[in-house]
UniProtKB/Swiss-Prot annotation:
It catalyses: L-glutamyl-tRNA(Gln) + L-glutamine + ATP + H2O = L-glutaminyl-tRNA(Gln) + L-glutamate + ADP + phosphate + H(+); L-aspartyl-tRNA(Asn) + L-glutamine + ATP + H2O = L-asparaginyl-tRNA(Asn) + L-glutamate + ADP + phosphate + 2 H(+). It comes from the Bacteria. InterPro entries: Asn/Gln-tRNA_amidoTrfase_suB/E, Asn/Gln-tRNA_Trfase_suB/E_cat, Asn/Gln_amidotransferase, Asn/Gln_tRNA_amidoTrase-B-like, GatB, GatB_C_1, GatB_Yqey_C_2, Gln-tRNA_amidoTrfase_suB_CS. The gene is gatB. This is Aspartyl/glutamyl-tRNA(Asn/Gln) amidotransferase subunit B.
């Protein structure tokens, strides 16, 4: 039987506010346990929550960016459940009247097509604390620093049909919230976490299958692996005569499998009711208009502009616009270096390789956009060749200065003197007289392969400094003269 996969995602994004959603406590990551928890966060009797307006503003920014309906009147509700890191015994969230309603996000698939993914809603809520198991023998510690950190939970429609589509959607959300500046997107620190709802159904069937939720997956790679593992588990289970049970599962990356955590709760299990300590939030049109006018250029618009303004391919434009920092870096390089396609190649390939090797982001790059742009100018004015440019780039990355100073100090300036190149080529051909005779006796097809040998010898003799274009032109004339 052929199966169709149905995937919906819930993405929890920690909003980049300076203080928590209902208290004045700081939200700094990595502080000593329980040093950033106020009486409100601890759930002490007699204290009242006060809503952080910045969290509301950030949620509205996101809603406008995905062309969603903004709830002009939205209500906070208590989500009741027991867990050791939830001191109040309930979580303040939103249920019937969320701040962000239906919207959509377009994602680019591997074959270049665009698919629209529906967003059901996005609502504000407070994060829970954190259970600490590693540092305690036979017991669990509780760190409430995270309790009360503002979250925007983004709930998609079940519109994805493969793990790769799901990853593309998460990457699009990740890029968007970073562009907006509402979340740092640091998945390793838990700033963006994903719950994956997965089900299968016979191909052509309209009714959804029984879904399982995989909780708290925190990397793009693990999202793909967890979903694929769960898909295979469900297929094997059904084809062996079993039934999928609706439940919450965890992904074990070491075993590459999901395992049962608990039966899946429904909304009525949490006994939601409006929080009596918080008034309904009324959002005025003027507040939204101020936010709308301040929205930055978003990834889809930037991709479109990169293609039309710089003549980039759809692939290159999507890669460069995948983060706001990378897009800004690229445009600064173009502003100085002038050639957009050359800049795109260096940013994506050479700089990208360096960043991967060092394990850092582009905002920590050891080569600034100004330095790279300056080096590209030297390629364009034939001061250095593309090959020598790699040596210059490595030196800049090692902190040896800008391109001009490195070229001067290392004597890397390209040889463009026709007389000097001509003399050098005569010496190369004299040293390879036998190959010259073979070249001249060969047919056109063999000559093409042999010509590369002479070019290589010439560049070796000049230590890579000879202008490649001049070498090719003069060499061809000498060999065929």
């Amino acid at each position: 039987m052929q199966w169709e996969v149905v995937i919906g995602l819930e993405i929890h994004t920690q909003l980049a506010t300076q203080s928590k959603i209902f208290s004045g406590s700081a939200t700094t990551f990595g502080s000593e346990p329980n040093t950033q928890a106020s009486l409100v966060d601890l759930g002490m009797p007699g204290v009242l929550p006060v809503l952080n307006q910045e969290a509301v503003r950030m949620a509205c920014m996101f809603g406008l960016a995905i062309d969603a309906q903004i709830g002009k009147r939205n209500v906070f509700a208590r989500k009741n459940y027991f867990y050791p890191d939830l001191p109040k015994g309930y979580q303040i969230s939103q249920m019937d009247l969320p701040i962000v309603g239906k919207g959509h996000l377009d994602i680019a698939l591997e074959d270049g097509t665009i698919k629209r993914i529906g967003v059901t809603r996005a609502h504000l809520e407070e994060d829970a604390g954190k259970s600490l198991h590693e540092d305690f023998s036979g017991s669990t510690g509780i760190d409430l620093n995270r309790a009360g950190t503002p979250l925007l939970e983004i709930v998609s429609e079940p519109d994805m049909r493969s793990a790769k589509e799901a990853v593309a959607y998460v990457k699009a959300i990740h890029a968007l919230v970073r562009y907006l500046g509402i979340c740092d997107g640091n998945m390793a620190e838990g700033s963006l976490r994903c719950d994956c709802n997965v089900s299968i159904r016979p191909k052509g069937q309209a009714e959804f299958g029984t879904r399982c939720e995989i909780k708290n997956v925190n990397s793009f790679r693990f999202i793909e692996r967890a979903i694929n593992s769960e898909i295979q588990r469900q297929i094997d289970l059904i084809e062996d005569g079993g039934k999928v049970v609706q439940e919450t599962r965890l992904y074990d990356p070491n075993k590459d499998e999901t395992r049962s955590m608990r039966s899946k709760e429904e909304a009525n299990d949490y006994r939601y009711f409006p929080d009596p300590d918080l008034l309904p939030v009324v959002i005025e049109d003027s507040f939204l208009e101020t936010i709308r006018t301040g929205l930055p250029e978003l990834p889809p618009q930037k991709v479109e502009r990169f293609q039309s303004q710089y003549g980039l391919s759809a692939y290159d434009a999507n890669v460069l616009a995948s983060s706001r920092e990378q897009a800004d870096y690229f445009e600064q390089v173009v502003k100085i270096g002038g050639d957009a396609k050359l800049a795109a190649n260096w940013v994506m390939v050479e700089l990208g390789s360096l960043l991967n090797k060092l394990g850092i982001e582009i905002d920590q790059a050891p080569v600034s956009a100004e330095q790279l742009g300056g080096m590209l100018l030297r390629i364009r004015d034939n001061t250095i060749s593309g090959k020598i440019a790699k040596t210059v780039f490595e030196a800049m990355a090692a902190g040896e200065g800008d391109a001009d100073s490195i070229i001067e100090s290392k004597g890397l300036k390209q040889v463009t003197d026709t007389g000097a190149i001509d003399k050098m080529l005569d010496e190369v051909l004299a040293a390879n007289a036998e190959q010259v005779e073979q070249y001249r006796a060969a047919d056109e097809a063999k000559r093409g392969k042999m010509f590369g040998f002479f070019v290589g010898q010439a560049m070796k003799a000049s230590k890579g400094k000879a202008n490649p274009g001049q070498v090719n032109q003069l060499l061809k004339a000498k060999l065929e003269g």
